[in-house]
């Protein structure tokens, strides 16, 4: 019998329409890896109480348990909420997932932070769709780990479904603007942006690493599972580390 494929479990915001096709496209070049998704309710991104309550762990843990039913090898939260909630939110979530399921867990943001360590990044430019106060919270959160996140562009949007409608020319202009402000590395920081497929173009165009948050969680899960990521080199320099 052939060895069982490595199974990645991905937690997905219910209104997200970008991360699943992008993640599937990445994994398509890895013949012994499959990816499986589980959703929980998220419809808007803001600092309002009802929006923050979407990220309470009980709903996320219920979605994680469904992934555990599939016998996945690792669970990744493909979302950026700890950027404004604080990194401890993701750390607590990962511990709770492992305690409930026995399966290791990671997140887009914790993986991004690992990537910054790997690449020696102390100044990180941000491209996001978020509201002013959400972006300000992200900047403050990154300051807690010594990363300057003040070079940024954001679009002052809050409805999650609309993030997927942001087109490549808009993202191209935003990335170019943040690079022009002397950001030595960039993060497209929202997993409902259709951005991961554009990373290699931006890296070649601007000569800086670009860490997309759909990509970071995939990278960290594959690292944990000791998967050869060389087939993913066309998704960005991240996958060469």
Per-range role (PLM):
Residues 1-62, 132-167:
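N-terminal glycine-rich anion-binding loop in soluble enzyme alpha/beta folds
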Residues 9, 73-78, 125-127, 183-190:
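Periplasmic-binding protein-like
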Residues 57-70, 170-183:
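Short, well-structured alpha-helical segments in soluble
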Residues 58-61, 103-122, 215-228:
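Hydrophobic alpha-helical segments within soluble ligand-binding/sensing domains
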Residues 64-106:
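Glycine/small-residue-rich loop that forms an oxyanion/phosphate-binding "nest" at active or ligand-binding sites
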Residues 93, 97-158, 239:
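Conserved beta-alpha
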Residues 157-162, 208-230:
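Short, flexible loop segments at boundaries between secondary-structure elements
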Residues 173-205, 217-218:
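Hydrophobic alpha-helical
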């Amino acid at each position: 019998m052939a060895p069982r494929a490595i199974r990645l479990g991905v937690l997905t915001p219910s209104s997200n329409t970008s991360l699943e096709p992008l993640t599937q496209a990445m994994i398509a070049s890895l013949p012994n890896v499959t990816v499986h998704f589980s959703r929980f309710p998220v419809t808007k991104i803001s600092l309002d109480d009802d929006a923050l309550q979407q990220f309470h762990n009980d709903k996320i843990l219920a979605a994680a348990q469904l992934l555990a039913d599939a016998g996945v090898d690792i669970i990744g939260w493909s979302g950026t909420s700890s950027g404004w909630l604080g990194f401890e939110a993701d750390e607590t979530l990962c511990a709770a997932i492992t305690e409930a399921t026995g399966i290791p867990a990671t997140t887009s943001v914790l993986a991004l932070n690992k990537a910054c360590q790997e690449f020696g990044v102390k100044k990180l430019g941000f491209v996001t769709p978020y509201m002013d106060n959400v972006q300000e919270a992200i900047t403050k959160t990154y300051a807690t780990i010594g990363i300057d996140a003040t070079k940024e562009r954001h679009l002052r949007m809050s409805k999650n479904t609309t993030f997927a409608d942001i087109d490549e020319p808009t993202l191209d202009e935003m990335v170019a603007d943040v690079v022009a402000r002397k950001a030595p590395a960039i993060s497209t920081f929202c997993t409902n942006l259709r951005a991961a497929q554009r990373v290699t173009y931006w890296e070649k165009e601007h000569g800086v690493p670009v860490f997309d948050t759909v990509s970071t969680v995939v990278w960290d899960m594959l690292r944990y599972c000791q998967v050869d990521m060389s087939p993913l080199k066309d998704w960005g320099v991240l996958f060469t580390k």
